Structure formats: structure tokens, C-alpha cells
Amino acid sequence: LPSHGSEQFSIELRGAYEAIKGLEGYTDQNYIEYSAEAKLMFPRFLAPFLSKSFRRRQTASSELSVSWDMQNRPEFYRRVFSTAWRYRWAEPRHHLNWRIDLLDLNYVYMPWISPTFKNDYLDDADNRNAILRYNYEDLFIMKIGFGITYNNGIDAMRANIETAGNLLNGAAKAFGLKKNGEGQYTLFNIAYAQYAKFDFDYTHLMQFDKRNALALHAGFGIAYPYGNSRVLPFEKRYFSGGDNSVRGWGVRELGPGKFRGTDGRIDFINQTGDLKLDLNAEYRTSLFWKFQGAFFVDAGNIWTLRSYDEQPGGQFKLDEFYKQIAVAYGLGIRLNFDYFILRFDMGMKAINPAYENEQEHWAIIHPRLSRDFAFHFAVGFPF
């Protein structure tokens, strides 16, 4: 909605649904997420510390956003309130877009945790998931970030870096605040996160003719918790598998490393890590009308940077990680309506690092549909 001063106000609503597999002891088996975001965009830099010539750039904008996210899982409910002030500007001649998150505040609130999940995995200090306890408590995240994207239609690149908690940690030490029983500084009795995170994505499109193309993609991410955080916040951790990753696995079903759960119930919650690698190749061809076909090969995994007893085989090691790269292959059907694309991907496991025996590790040689097949529905291309 434009205003008289050329400012623009927008509201965005999103929803997601996931049917969770392999969960026992819970009455609900579904994951539902709703979110709403309001943005007020000014078509100029609102920053007195910048030069007038820089602020006059027509492609620059300042943005104030407020959002609310509601996540309902069988094990817990999570609410995230966020507000941010950021700057964006573009260099069309060089196909570049820049973003600075000057200040991004997030408050993570946990209104409900299932008694089953709480008793089995959070309250028992000897339980193998005790190290993740703080990820299911209320939390503040105060971060700053920088991002750059490049896209000329053939090559696309995206890089982001963010840090959180450094200003709060410096203030806590300067004012001589005391730590809580968990060894953390708090703000209004709520701990704040401290970490650094870097993400990089690159895609190359080889267009053979109007009907056929090959898309190559590589993605890498690494995040390190320190200071006031022993592990990354749940929202900042990496997961593998799903419609935009290694498509032979469902969301959060792969990794870290060669880790494989032993109870078969709740381990997918812990299948997250601090480092992620994705490698993808997808051949795309036009079929008829709005239908397009695809054949893809995906590879990747996630790892932890530290060794956790709770995730054996999950730590990244330079001399072992390449043996833990999962591989999948499959076919896809897409409905391309120009303004949006409906995507149906069917993936099969080819190499499963969670198993060492030949029949399950080399799934491409010994395929089993019930064990190795994954179906994905999504909107838009995977990369």
C-alpha cells in the first residue's frame, strides 16, 4: 500500500503443514506453522551518518518490519516475535543487491511443552538430550547482519553473515551483571543467544535450448555458538533433507554425519547441526502445456562442530566428512504457471551414511521403496 510520501506498507501471511512420521507417545502427529509480517518501506536511506550522495541513491530503501510466528508441534508450542530495522540498495548494472540488518530483535517464547517430551528429554539430566534443554526455553536473540546477492540470469550467488549477542554480552560485563545457575547472562531473567553464522549459495544455469537446461547448485553454511550460548538457538541450526536439500530424505531426517537414532521416536528433533553442505544437479525439460520434467542428483549432510555424546558420529572431521556425504536421486514434475511453480519431487536414497552394512549404506544397489523413497511437494524451484 503506497502512501503520499512514496512509503510502502505491506502485510504478508504464511502457513505450513507437515505430517510427522515416527513419533510415538503423542496425541498429535502434526506440525502447523502460521506467521504474519508487516513491513514499512521508505524509498531512501534514513541514516544521518551516511553522506548525502549515498543517501540519494534511487535504488536504496530503509525497512522497518514486525513479525509474529506461531509453531505448534506435538512436543511443544513455540512463538517468535521479531522486529528489525534494515537497509537495502541495488546496483542494477552489476546485478547486485545489498542488505544490512542494523538491528534485529527476536523474542522466542515457549508457552507449552508436552509432559511426555519434558519428562523424557528435558528434566532428566542424565538423558542423552539434556544438552539441548536450553533450546526449549524462552530466549532473546539480538543480531546484526549483512547480505549480498548477485543474479545475471545464468549465475546466482547469495552470501549472508550475522552475529548475535556481542553487544549484550559487552554490556553485561561492563555493568558487572551476574550469571544465572546455567552460567549465562540474562535480560529480564531470560537468556540471550551469542553466535556467529555464515551462509553461501551458488547456482549456475546451463541453458541448452528453449526446452532443456541443467542447473548446478552448491550451498554451504556454518554457525558457531560461543560466550553466552553452548548450542545454537533452534531457529539458527541447520537441518538436512526435504524439498530444497537432499531429496531422498524427509525434512530433518538426515544427519548429523553418520548419526542414527536408537529409539526411533524423537531423534529427528536432534538431527540438526552447526555446519551444512548441499550439492545438487538438476536436468530440466519442458514436456507439454505447463508441465515440466526434471531428473536430479543431490548430495550433502550436516555436522556438529563440537563432539556431543548425544549425537555420536555427528562431529565434523576433515578426514571423515567426505565418507558421510549422503546421495539421492529422483524425478520431478513441475507445473509452471509463470507467476508461480508447483513442484512434485520423488527422491530415492542412493548412499546412506547412517548405515555401515552394504545393503542399507549402498541403497542404490539394494533399493527398497518403503525405506528409501521420499515425496516432496513445494512451490518454486529448489534453487
Question: Where on the chain are the PLM-derived regions?
Answer:
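Membrane-proximal, glycine/serine-rich, low-complexity loop/turn segments characteristic
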Residues: 1-4, 29
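Strand-connecting loop/turn motifs
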Residues: 4-8, 61, 93, 154, ...
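Transmembrane beta-strand segments of outer-membrane beta-barrel domains in Gram-negative
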Residues: 16, 23-221
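Flexible loop/turn segments at secondary-structure boundaries
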Residues: 17-22, 73-76, 165-169, 222-228, ...
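Short beta-alpha connecting loops at secondary-structure transitions
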Residues: 19-28, 234, 313-318, 325-327, ...
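Extended beta-strand-rich architecture
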Residues: 90, 134-332, 375
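C-terminal beta-signal and adjacent terminal beta-strands/loops
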Residues: 299-316, 339, 347-365, 381-383
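Outer-membrane beta-barrel "beta-signal"
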Residues: 335-340, 369-383
